[in-house]
Amino acid sequence: MKQYLDLVQSILDQGAWQENRTGVRTLSLPGAALRFDLQQGFPAVTTKKLAFKSAIGEMVGFLRATRSAAQFRALGCKVWDQNANENEQWLANPYREGPDDLGPVYGVQWRHWPAYKLLPSSAGGQVADALARGYRQVAEVDENGAPHVLLYKAVDQLRQCLDTIRQSPGDRRILFHGWNWAQIEEMALPPCHLLYQFLPNAGTREISLCLYIRSNDVGLGTPFNLTEGAALLHLVGRLTGYKPRWFSYFIGDAHVYENHLPMLREQLAREPYPAPQLVLSDRIPDFAVTGKYEPQWLEQVEPGDFTLSGYQHHAPLTAPMAV
């Protein structure tokens, strides 16, 4: 995957040293972008062995709104163990609900975003509209001396994206995100990959994805997040009847940890292999074949439903994760 190596080299050439919360310095480069044509292959790093099963396990956990490191481990992903149980700041957080708890991270926001409306009790039309949209009244409160009603519902952002792809593919607002200011302090780690926008084309029957990541550990996180984003696009395409096409990957703070430099320099010395192909299990219904819309498969997929075909890679390389 030459694009990945080019990004690493750009950070080494143009990045500036910064201190950060982890205590391990980073070479950081503001504003970076990668773009992949998924018809030409899957964006798997080949200059070391990709932890594919772990990355897919994490993605499946997100789709199931997982908030426990134990549940991620059961899916074959151990990357949350340290953040859940070894981060001193999180261990002292009053919102932590015991061992392995992560708080309302990523998938909780994707699938169960807590939405509230505070409306004047006298605004009957507004209240009626909110109730018709699935909100329910949870309290009556006094706000600035006037009676109000508080209404709540959990928003499944990802399901709404799929519904819109099916019903209105020309819509340019088919997106979901995980940055919930009201709950950031309740999370073991605020979301890094935080905004996903789907771009279907009803004429070509192709679907593309733009992913924005506020902060990306290029040594360890980028290969993981590329895998998850591309796999998610393949899955959404399968469930809605579109072929995955362009995957655009934007990074706010692209950085390399100082103790990852030996691993990355070794990768730069290796020649990338051709891109593999992602294969989805026949268990997952293909809307283009069946004509049946089955969005419930968002939470029914298993890690074993995703495999790489023709994946060649160099020897594994490891580096410590900064927490």
From Swiss-Prot:
The active site is at C192. It comes from the Bacteria. Pfam families: Thymidylat_synt (PF00303). SUPFAM superfamilies: Thymidylate synthase/dCMP hydroxymethylase (SSF55831). Its EC number is 2.1.1.45. (6R)-5,10-methylene-5,6,7,8-tetrahydrofolate binds at D217, A322. Keywords: Cytoplasm, Methyltransferase, Nucleotide biosynthesis, Transferase. GO terms for molecular function: thymidylate synthase activity. InterPro entries: Thymidate_synth/dCMP_Mease, Thymidate_synth/dCMP_Mease_dom, Thymidate_synth/dCMP_Mease_sf, Thymidylate_synthase, Thymidylate_synthase_AS. One of its GO terms (biological process) is methylation. GO terms for cellular component: cytosol. Belongs to the thymidylate synthase family. Bacterial-type ThyA subfamily. This is Thymidylate synthase. It comes from Bordetella pertussis (strain Tohama I / ATCC BAA-589 / NCTC 13251). The lineage of its organism: Bacteria, Pseudomonadati, Pseudomonadota, Betaproteobacteria, Burkholderiales. The gene is thyA.
